Amino acid sequence: MQNLTISPLSTLPQVRVLGRCAGTDPLTLFWTGSGIELLFTGSELWVELNADYDTMEPWVSVELDGAWISRFAVNPGTSRMCIFRGAAPGRAKHVRLLKDVQAMSEDPAHLLQVTAICHAGGEFLPLPAPRCRLEFIGDSITSG
């Protein structure tokens, strides 16, 4: 592990928050599919997560350049998950980290937060605007 720079999400305006989330320090991921998306040109990238649960552990999925590369349960407490290291510096890598389970109302202790991005070298680039957007109109189940 190189010397990593630890950056709270609030210091990285290029990181896109996905889903309905409030605040960024820490970013609490409550809903399925909520997460973060970013473009990074460095050689090493880690995500610092905070999790808790009594019976139903939180799971996350990671996509790198459009390919699903990992799915894992997050252990209780604060931990760092390596997204990539030893990657070609200077080339932009497109990363998405998504909560892979639903909100767990049966487990009041269930918690998943992104607390920081840890990185070596490179820079965060602005993401292009999404090609299309969907709007769901419906009852309280659909709209919250």
Task: Please tell me what each predicted stretch does.
Residues 1-137, 142-144:
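N-terminal secretory targeting modules
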